[in-house]
């Protein structure tokens, strides 16, 4: 019997732009880390950027298991938490750093579900979490993208399509589908394609047994020229889906 040819989803170069953002090193323990760091930040008064940074780094070092953490990893934690979750606001011109309302909310309410809802509601592209060199491409491509909002819209549109076919199934999304059909398609992230069109594409791809990750696809190549793994390709969409689960969305 002849081997069945694998059919891959093909997104033309002109529509491809890989969405990426800061990924915390502590993601496997994110709930405990965020609750701890929110509390520690709220104990630091408004002070100079240097003083706040010292107190903040010391708080990271005192988190259980971090006492012998390498300096580079400590610095990664230091930049990742404010970049992604905005736990403090640094004004270098005035030389003052203040703990943010997001950190205060989490510390006072101890409500991770609501915290992640607030986070996802405001997390967008372009956004303050991005590096300047990445912002240039996002703006040039006219990308205006709120990941969680778009995912919810696609799920709702998918439910309508399934219901119209008398299906009792509910729409779902895998990290691969979210990566290739939503995150990395400029037509979606710039609002040129409706959520209903995205949902239809995904459902059609399932029906036609279309695969997504293809190590031979030039889009999978890293800067070194090696192919990224499936996990590398889908990690950002996977993160947002995980955060949505924590937000009970």
For the regions a language model picked out, list residue spans one by one.
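Donor-sugar nucleotide-binding helix/loop cap in glycosyltransferases
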Residues: 2-249
């Amino acid at each position: 019997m002849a081997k069945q040819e694998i059919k891959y989803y093909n997104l033309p170069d002109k529509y491809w732009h890989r969405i990426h953002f800061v990924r915390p090193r502590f993601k496997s323990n994110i709930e405990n880390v965020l609750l701890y760091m929110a509390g520690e930040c709220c104990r630091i008064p408004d002070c100079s950027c240097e003083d706040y940074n010292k107190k903040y780094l010391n708080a990271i070092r005192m988190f259980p298991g971090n006492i012998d953490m390498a300096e580079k990893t400590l610095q990664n934690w230091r930049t990742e938490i404010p970049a992604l979750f905005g736990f403090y606001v640094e004004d270098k011109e005035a030389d003052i750093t203040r703990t943010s309302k997001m950190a205060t909310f989490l510390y006072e309410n101890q409500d991770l579900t609501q915290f992640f809802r607030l986070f996802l509601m405001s997390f967008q592209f372009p956004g303050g979490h991005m590096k300047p060199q990445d912002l240039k491409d996002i703006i040039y491509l006219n990308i205006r993208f709120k990941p969680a909002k778009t995912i919810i819209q696609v799920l709702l549109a998918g439910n309508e399509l399934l219901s119209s076919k008398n299906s009792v199934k509910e729409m779902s999304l895998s990290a691969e589908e979210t990566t290739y059909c939503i995150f990395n398609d400029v037509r979606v992230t710039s609002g040129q394609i409706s959520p209903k069109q995205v949902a239809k594409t995904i459902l059609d791809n399932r029906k036609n047994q279309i695969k997504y990750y293809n190590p031979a696809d030039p889009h999978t190549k890293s800067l070194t020229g090696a192919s990224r793994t499936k996990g590398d390709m889908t990690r950002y969409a996977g993160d947002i889906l995980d955060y949505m689960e924590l937000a009970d969305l």
